Amino acid sequence: MSRGSSAGFDRHITIFSPEGRLYQVEYAFKAIAQENITTVALKSGDCAVVATQKKVTEKNIVPETVTHLFRITKDIGCAMTGRIADSRSQVQKARYEAANFRYKYGYEMPVDVLCRRIADINQVYTQNAEMRPLGCSMVLIAYDNEIGPSVYKTDPAGYFSGFKACSVGAKTLEANSYLEKKYKPNLSEEKAIQLAISCLSSVLAIDFKPNGIEIGVVSKSDPTFRILDEREIEEHLTKIAEKD
């Protein structure tokens, strides 16, 4: 459908077009892709891994202040893809929800419950005229004592689901295709990290430097969400280069 034939339906979040589309929600997905960041996440064996690009857009920016990985609780981490201001707002909301859950019930909020709650909030943003959908997508990883490693994703439409492997961002179709071909269910932590790096490197057609990628990991042996430092990333990049 042409731009002109939308007949004003793109101006209102709460009104469906005759074709059953919510244009403002679709535009939120486009905002995510326009940030030109790709994120991949996977769970395998006893670990879950998330990897995303790190882009420092100006020379005068302090690199340590640029990140797309955030800790929600001690054991739940996330990668945010899309508009960074919207991303930080959603992370803050997730932290509040997790803290409130712990205060009310006395134990940590499970990752699937947290993702469902964030998705529910996102869905409300699609039906209230005074709000706009957030231009970001959240990928959560955690190690759950009952269900093992977990990867969950939610988006501006309020959809959420658990995944064995998933991607978000500019090259999501290519990354999903790569993961479908290469994914194995019983990878070690090292192999899972290297698969995530190789996936991003392949679909983006670039050779990463340690300061150009961020990686978060949780595992059965260390369920605390941990962000790898540049030295650890360099070790994995070296091993990938040696295999090639």
Curated annotation (Swiss-Prot):
GO biological process terms on file: proteasome-mediated ubiquitin-dependent protein catabolic process
Keyword Nucleus on this protein? Answer: yes
Task: List the GO terms this entry assigns under cellular component, sorted alphabetically.
Answer: cytosol; nucleoplasm; nucleus; proteasome complex; proteasome core complex; proteasome core complex, alpha-subunit complex
Keywords annotated in UniProt: Cytoplasm, Nucleus, Proteasome
Q: Does the keyword ATP-binding apply?
A: no
Biological role: The proteasome is a multicatalytic proteinase complex which is characterized by its ability to cleave peptides with Arg, Phe, Tyr, Leu, and Glu adjacent to the leaving group at neutral or slightly basic pH. The proteasome has an ATP-dependent proteolytic activity.
Q: What is this protein called?
A: Proteasome subunit alpha type-6
Supply the source organism for this entry. Answer: Drosophila melanogaster
Ranked from the top, the taxonomy reads: Eukaryota, Metazoa, Ecdysozoa, Arthropoda, Hexapoda
Q: Its gene?
A: Prosalpha1
